[in-house]
Structure formats: C-alpha cells, structure tokens
Amino acid sequence: NGTRFKPRDIEAVVPGTPAFDEQMMGLARWAADYYQAPLGELLRAGLPQGERAEAVRQVRLTAAGERAARDPGGGSPQIALDGVGASAPVGDPLLRLLLEAGGEVPWRLIARRLAGRGGPTATAAAAAAHIGRLEAAGLVEVGDEVRDRRAPPTRRFVAAAASDVVSAAVLPARARARRAVLEKVRAAPADEGLAVDALTASERAQLRALTNAGLVRVEQRPIPLSKAGADDQVGAPAARVGAKAGECPPTPTAGQAHAIREIIDALGKGYATFLLQGVTGSGKTEVYLRVIAEARAAGRGALVLVPEIALTPQLAGRFRARFGDDVAVLHSALPPRERLAAWRRLRLGEVGIALGARSAVFAPVRELGVLVVDEEHDPSFKQEEGVRYHGRDMAVMRAQRAGAVAVLGSATPSLESRRNAELGRFRHLLLPERATPRTLPPVEIVDLRRHPPGPDGLLSTPLAEAVAANLAAGQQTILFLNRRGFSTVVLCRACGLVVRCAHCAVSMTYHRGRDRLVCHYCGTQESVPALCPACRLPKLERLGMGTERVEALIREQFPDARVARLDRDTAGASAAGAPERGGHLNEVLRAMNAGEIDILVGTQMVTKGHDFGGVTLVGVLQPDQAMHLPDFRASERVFQLLEQVAGRAGRGDRPGRVIVQTYNPEHPAIVAVRTHDYEGFVRAELEARAELGYPPFTRMVVLRLDGPDEARVRADARAAADAAVSVGGTRVRLRGPAEAPIPRVRGRSRFQVWLASVERAPLAAAARAGSAVKLGPDVRLVVDVDPQSTL
C-alpha cells in the first residue's frame, strides 16, 4: 500500500542457504493468513537466535582520524565537542576508543563504551552529535554493514607476515609498544596466530599501524559450531533420568503392534493424521520410537513435539538411547549457540530427528516423514504471546504440506481432535490397556463436606491415613495441588481488605521462601506490610493454600518423610513466573526415580509424562477452584489434568491408588475420573458444547484490547465489535465487548470481543474488519484465532 509504506532500495543480498525452504515458506504464509499475523513476525518466531541477518551501523576511523588519535597535539584540526563552541584536540576519547577497537565500533555500543571515560560523549544523544561533527571533519566515516548472522560465528586473529617480505626495521625506533606487540604475535604458532581479543586494549591499538606496515595480517575465522549439546542437550542429569542405553526394545503389546502396523503402512503414501489414544502407561512412546525408526530406515526425517521439553527429560533420554546422535533437541533452556548448532545440523542433514517444544514445529528437518505431537491436548501448545499459533495445528498442516504422517498422542485427547476423528479427518487408534500387567489405579473420591480436612485445612482423614500407610510401606506418594506459593490471599481480619497487585486486578500471593508478596501475572514483588494498608491495624492474615504451604505442612505432619516440591518456583522460575529450567528440576526427577523422595508435592509439572515406578499413591488436594473458572473448557481441563496425574500411580511393580478430595463429588469431571471414563465424559461434554455453540462445533476468534485508559479501551472495543458485525452480518455471532475476567494486568485495562461462526471465511473477514479500526493512543489490539483461554 503506497499510501502507508515507502519502499526502500535493496542494499545487499545475504549469501548462503535460505533459513526456510519453499515448503516451510508456504506453511508460514498459511499460518500468517490463518492467525492474522505479520509474516515477518511468524518467521522470526520460527528462527533460533543467531539465524537472522541484520544491518549494523558502523563508525570507522579514517586515515586522518587515526593520525589524530595517535598524535592529539600534532597540528590536527580542532572541532567543537560540546556543540556550543568549546574546542579540544581531535584526539578525544571517541577516536581513541575506535583506535583501540581496531578501527571500528558499532554505533549502538559507542555511548556505553564511553560511559566510563567521561566527557560530553557519554550519552547516546551526545555521542550521536559528536559522531556527526567528527564525520564532517573527515575523521570518521559511518556506514551500514550487512552481517549474516546465519553464517558461523567468527573470531579475529592476527598472524605475522612472512619474515622475508618485510622487516621490523620499518618501524620507527621509538615505536617500542608496536615492537612488543609484533614480538608477541610472532611468538604465536604460525598456523594459528593470536586471537585479537586476547590482546589488551593498548596492544590492540597498535594493530592498525602494524597491518599498514605489512608486518601482520588480521583475519576473521569461522568458529566451528560446537557439537556439545548434540549428545547432551537436555543436561547430564536429564539424560541420566531417562536414558536406558543398551536396553533392548520391549516386545509390543497387541494394541501397540496394531498401531505400529497401521502407521508404518501409511508412511510414504502421502499425508495422513492418526489420533493415538492410549491410557496412561499404555506405551505410546514405544509406538513413536518404532514408527520413527522405520521412517529413518527409509531415509525420512522425524519431528517430535512435546508440551514443554524441560518437563520431559525422560522422553529425550529414551530417544537418545534408541537413536544416539541422530537426535537434535531444540530446547529453550539451551545456550543460544547450542540451539543454533542443533538447528544447523538438522538443516545440513547431519541429524534426522528433532525433538522440541512448540516452536520446534519450524525445525528444518529434511525429507520429513513422520511428525509426532505428544500430549496433543496440552494447552501449552498454544502460543499466548506474539503470534498466537497452535503448535499442534501447525504440525498437522506441516505434515499435510510435506506429504508426511502426523501422530497425535494423548490419554485424554482434546475434544477438537476427538471430533476430527469422528468426522474421519483423523484415523483413530486405541491403546486401551497399560503396557505392563498393572491396570489403571482405582480412584477414590473423598467428599470434604462429610470428611472435612484437619485443622490445617490440608488432608482429610482418609488421605492422611493413606499417606501414613504408604510411608510405612516404604512407597512413594505424589500430592497434587495446582497452585504455587504459600498463601493465595493476604486478608485483613479487621476491615476485610485483600492485598492486591497495584498493577493487576488480582490478589498477591505470599511466598514464604522469599518472604515476599508476588503477583503471578506481572511479577511485581512487595514486602509483607506489618499493618493493613487501609485500616492500619495489625490484623493481616495469610489464607488459602499453595504448594509451598502444603510442603511445609507435610513436613510438620510427617517429620521423618523425605519431602520435595516441584513447581515453577523450585524449577527456577523468575518473579513473573516464566521458568528458567535448570538443574533442580532434573535433580528432583533423578531423586524420585532413585527412591530418594518419599512425598513429592507439586503442581501440573508432576503430571507431564513422568514415569515414576515407585509411586503407589496420588492425592489430589483441591481441584474445585479449577472447575468453576469462567471458561467453557474448564471441565475438560480438570478431567484431563486429574486423569493425567492419576496415571502417575501404579506404573511399577506394585499397584497404585488415587484419592481425590473435593467439595463437588458430583461434578461431571470428578464422576468420570472415578472410573477413568473418558468416553462417557466426552459424549456428555460434546453434547453440551453442541447445544451452546462452542468449539469443536463452531470456530472462534477473540479480539483482545488493552491500554492504560479504561474508557478509551472500552470505546475502541465497541468500535471493533461494530466493525466486525458490519462485515460478518448474521453469519457471525458476537459476544461483548466486555471486560476480561481479569480486567487489569500490568496497569492496563483489558476488554474482549468474542466472534463465533460455523464458517471460517466470514469469521476471518469479521476479525480483520474489527482489528483494522483506528485505536486510541497506547491501545493495543491482538487477534487470537482459536483461543484456548478466556482469561
């Protein structure tokens, strides 16, 4: 659109292999259209750090500038440094900085590097003005340099020129510093030279003169990308948790053998998607491994997506045990260089199997033959920041475009995938029994209205007795509570005030380990006030319960037990709740597998596919809050979560049991979990969704608006809704605009406009019209296609 964008000339073409081939570009274009996102943002989301070319503005010394830097008093011209007429010798700190850096420095780094040297160029604005004056005086030149960050990283080396070509005698007698640097360079191995960054700043300042004299040569050399990470990209502890090297593959069960035959038969015959529904412990991973082995034998690549790779080290270990170095793990916790190395090894065809989380759907696997999405129901596959794509749906589309086979695995498939199977879009395969002789554990429901928890509000008598018996028998227990922190509410007993985040419409959570109040939405931390902020009385009390408090109470109730906790805090979470996965997680998993933990307290992190053979009891503490979230998927999510955590019990040699304590034993999800009745739950839930017009019987898009001014955001949401309806007409159903269930986050008011239709085209057109309205200052609008959260 020429009225909005001014085209610019192409200044350079970056050489080398494109990051995306035609097939992947086609997928990216489809996704950009479907999710109504800029193509560039989508491509950026699919590239690892370091896999992009960029233009860098460089400031370089001219010959005159070098002379001025070396000899400030040598009669060089004078220029104003402060912009108001004051003069100084041209040999100022900026010229000296450029000289010491070898003659050039990126523009963006100059102010930072000068900050410690003082003078008028220590700020970005002053540095920019000063660069302009130096450029006008002919002392520096400024230009853009296109850097191909996709090329291997380089390092500057200096080596001595051949001694028979030039002699050090050309150096002035007083150039002792240059002679010393020359001797240092000549002392280095002739075939290797000396790394420039190993020299001091004063030594580097001599290189330009030595180069001009022909005594040394400076060159950029590529650094070989380390294959570290190819063998242990999930960390040594993780590898120890899951790998069972040298172990013979188990004999498949009848159900596994049937599934393997069906999928292998489809390999090489074009696109197909299988929904592999298997109860927890049924051996879905073994099916993946055997199908991938067949694909690799045929020269086809494989891609495996998991909800969160840091939470499933056992899967990575099993793949390495079976396929060795043919596996590249794309993990957000990897150092950028290792992640980039894995990406490039895939692109070069050095490895043929990629294993990773959501963004690994873009991995450059050659000749893709099979694509696996493990735990396909998990909401983590939906991106909630940036481009809101769904990893599972992108995987199916990628398989379709590659003529590959997609396998979606789950014990509790999403209703969308189950509906696709019913309509014949996916081929449905069942693994109804566990791969071991053990059956699914029985589930006991404790009605807390009849059996209230003890004085601490934690364990009912039946669950407390079961934990004690399990300890006495030397067996392991998992206690599941999907809320972290110590107390979920800090309330004043005098006036009723609940301490809330100043930026978000949510209460602060008390974390005893930090002795701080933390907002789990924006990351704000505060000290705990001694007095109520409203009535100024010392009546604040910590109410509610999170995993941190459960851990403390369990340690008090069972002092001889070895207790551990697994949630985003213990796994190394930042204040805002974004996990920086580290060694503690893997250490907990290792200790559980080694039998060194008696009771593990955790959030949904304990449900993510872990295979703890010693766990014979799972206790679910408070599932009630999740049942009543303002989300049409609330029942489905509760059932999936409870069925997954129940599946952690009885996976080893001894039978397991599950105890769920709840105030709502008649809730459909609880009733279904009691008998592991996925089919009954799905039938009832699909009937309810069809009657109410919810997915999978309709498509949805939500326009999310936020901004600092509530009235402005409300008005813009109304305008977006009106624009959407004017285009969608009667074929699109409108709900809203309305405040979001959490109406304020990070100081920004939030409104939502929900659009629904059984037809994609009018829904997409309505969403585009709504998102095109003119917004007020600092109002942001995000289009979320196929939203997975109503909050």
List where the protein language model places each region.
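Accessory, non-ATPase domains that flank or precede helicase/AAA+ motor cores in DNA-metabolism machines
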Residues: 1-410, 417, 422-438, 471-472, ...
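Inter-lobe coupling/hinge segments of SF2-like helicase ATPases
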Residues: 248-253, 257-261, 269-714, 718, ...
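A short linear hydrophobic-aromatic micro-motif
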Residues: 731-737
